[in-house]
């Protein structure tokens, strides 16, 4: 069910046609304008294509600023919209329809399209999409560089010893709507105007389900991506850093697997979302150059 099904496009023209079709479908789907899938394209296949996948309840605009900088540096940049995200109605319950199968099929499609946009494929995701990046890194050998920012492998308030038990329990719970901040609700200052201020718990459960799946795969076989980097916020308030470290260890138990770590220091006192420009308390002018530098340094490193 969660086996990757690669079907790469043949060329740049086909890749652009696929993205155009995605955008047209989203335009009919009441998607907020800034949340429609973005493609910053040089008109031809470039050496590198960078896929930037927005976080849970956010939308492609989250990565727009970072994406433009990668584009100006010479890469094609693909910023897709995850299923059921970015709709004009911020209080929609559409996310209740999201499944782990939707996420893996979506991820496969992105990598397939990327083949026409760049000779080498880089994919980056944050939070829930960081979990998807982990699944892609586990299953797709055609990924050259995978970056997972604060991936959701567990929740910070759940002790590591109880993570697997918690994941199995939440799969059985009925769905209900949760605010990111129950005090401010729809007026949450940390939830920017194009992101959802809350979510159906069933959608969060599907990301946890995906985490369980990729963890089970990692116990059986090594990741297929060539280079993997985990980006960890040492002051992370939402996802479990302990589970991220455990997952890195799980991967590195396999022969010839090295997972790099990049840490944003605890002294920075960052919130969970370190990507969205305009988020209170996030020094974007400091964070973006570091993220760009990490990718640039790996891209320029001679192949072994």
Regions found by a protein language model. Name each.
Residues 4-31, 151-219, 263-287:
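The alpha/beta-hydrolase serine catalytic core
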Residues 84-97:
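Glycine-rich "HGGG/HGxG" loop immediately N-terminal to the catalytic nucleophile
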């Amino acid at each position: 069910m969660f086996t990757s099904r690669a079907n790469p496009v043949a060329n740049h023209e086909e890749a652009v046609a696929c993205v155009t079709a995605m955008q047209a479908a989203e335009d009919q789907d009441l998607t907020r304008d800034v949340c429609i899938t973005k493609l910053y394209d040089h008109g031809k296949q470039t050496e590198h294509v960078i896929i930037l996948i927005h976080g849970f309840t956010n939308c492609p605009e989250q990565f727009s600023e970072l994406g433009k900088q990668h584009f100006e540096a010479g890469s094609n940049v693909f910023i897709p919209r995850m299923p059921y995200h970015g709709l004009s109605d911020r209080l929609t319950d559409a996310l209740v329809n999201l499944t782990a199968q939707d996420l893996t099929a979506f991820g496969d499609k992105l990598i397939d399209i990327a083949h026409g946009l760049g000779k080498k494929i880089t994919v980056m995701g944050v939070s829930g999409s960081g979990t998807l990046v982990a699944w892609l890194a586990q299953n797709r050998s055609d990924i050259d560089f995978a970056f997972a920012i604060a991936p959701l492998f567990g929740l910070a308030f759940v002790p590591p010893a109880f993570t697997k038990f918690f994941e199995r329990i939440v799969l059985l719970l009925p769905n209900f709507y949760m605010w990111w901040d129950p005090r401010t609700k729809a007026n949450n200052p940390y939830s920017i105007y194009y992101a959802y201020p809350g979510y159906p718990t069933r959608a969060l459960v599907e990301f946890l389900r995906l985490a369980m799946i990729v963890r089970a795969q990692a116990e059986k076989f090594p990741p297929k991506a060539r280079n993997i980097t985990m980006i960890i916020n040492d002051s992370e308030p939402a996802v479990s850093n302990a589970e991220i470290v455990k997952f890195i260890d799980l991967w590195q138990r396999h022969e010839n697997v090295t997972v790099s770590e990049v840490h944003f220091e605890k002294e920075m006192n960052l919130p969970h979302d370190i990507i969205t420009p305009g988020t209170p308390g996030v020094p974007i002018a400091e964070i973006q150059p570091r993220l760009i530098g990490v990718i640039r340094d790996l891209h320029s490193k001679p192949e072994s």
